[in-house]
Amino acid sequence: LNRLVDDQTLGYPSQLFHVSEVTYRSGELLVKGMRVVPDGSLRNGSAILYLRGGYRQVGMVRMARMIQYASLGFIVFAPYYRGNAGGEGVDEFGGADLEDAYSGFDLLQEDRRVDPDRIHVVGFSRGGVMAAPTAVNRPVASLTSWGAVSNCFRMYDERKDMGRLLRRTFQGPPEQARRTYQIRSPLNMAHLIQAPVQIVHATEDVHVPVVHALEWHRALTVSGVPVTLSLIRNQGHRMTPKLQYEWTKRICEWMKQQEKGS
């Protein structure tokens, strides 16, 4: 089954990057995402499945951010998640929409320019809830959790502004839908992760507090998963573009090191 259905070029001024909006098959649905392919002189077969944060229009995939990763030699694919930007279905915040992440990985595997053993997954914020199961269900080269949610019970308690969204997408509050909160929390998958993991988190993050990173690190360590933890001091959920790019270079360097070890 070929997952690619359509590929529409998006305007980008530099010849070094080809940016397109892709329509692809995810189960029975047609969903969308952004693909950035760096020039042949920059790339070496490595790829990143970038799993965005937010919900619907909040936290939508940004071209400039994807170019940062692509400039470091990676073909990047970032699903928008179902129900967004003309994609079919409904975004469930880590429910059936997980298939959009799995199929995004498969789409990269089907790309002849990609080495199937060198596909890395990055989950930012809510993307952490998408990235951990992807690392369990697909042969990822590595997993990066950046400012990522690891505990859905915590997310419900910490973010009163997200209560309504979580009650809708998780079919109720934790006391009613305990099982759903459990199975969607990356913490409960730590023992199933096979790939090396790097965790990057800002100490002053108020959207996803740093305790998510500390608990995730502990669960992975106890489970015997190779894991590194980097805390970014005096920064919040979003940082300056310059600092963001410095950390992006760092995490991509780590990804390349994992490939050498494979």
Where are the language model's segments positioned?
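Alpha/beta-hydrolase active-site loop
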Residues: E92-R112
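Alpha/beta-hydrolase fold nucleophile elbow
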Residues: V114-S125
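Active-site nucleophile loop of the alpha/beta-hydrolase fold
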Residues: T144-R154
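Short beta-strand/loop motif that positions the catalytic acidic residue
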Residues: I193, I199-H201, D205
